[in-house]
């Protein structure tokens, strides 16, 4: 998020996103490290929190892991819609959450597809709720 603020000269990330998108990109992701990520497209905004972890050993490589998971999901599905990008952010965030559990990317060599699916479900449970206004 600091890069977005520096590039746009705006402190508000919503304003920063508008300034940056006025420079050309139609879609913008602003990563907020341990606080999640924001996806901007047109008038739509999606926020994905980071998974709350008790132990964060080392954030080295987490941003690259997030990007790799995001792009891999888009490449695998060949669906570049806003809705699928929301899913891609969750996939990237899930993979990044593994990365911080050990030094560098070591933890990524220890996980399998079932671990990834379970972590993604943790994200779904974190943000999925029903609300009924009274």
Task: Show where each model-derived region lies.
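Anionic group-transfer/hydrolysis microenvironments
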Residues: 1-2, 33
């Amino acid at each position: 998020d600091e890069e977005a603020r520096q590039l746009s000269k705006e402190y508000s990330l919503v304003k920063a996103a508008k300034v940056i998108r006025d420079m050309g990109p139609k879609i913008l992701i602003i990563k907020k490290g341990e606080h999640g990520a924001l996806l901007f497209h047109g008038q739509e905004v999606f926020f994905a929190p980071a998974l709350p972890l008790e132990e964060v050993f080392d954030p080295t490589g987490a941003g690259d892991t997030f990007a790799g998971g995001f792009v891999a999901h888009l490449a695998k599905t060949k669906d570049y819609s806003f809705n699928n990008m929301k899913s891609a952010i969750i996939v990237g965030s899930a993979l990044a959450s593994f990365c911080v559990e050990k030094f560098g990317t070591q933890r990524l060599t220890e996980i399998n597809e079932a671990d990834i699916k379970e972590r993604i479900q943790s994200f779904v449970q974190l943000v999925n709720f029903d609300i009924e206004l009274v």
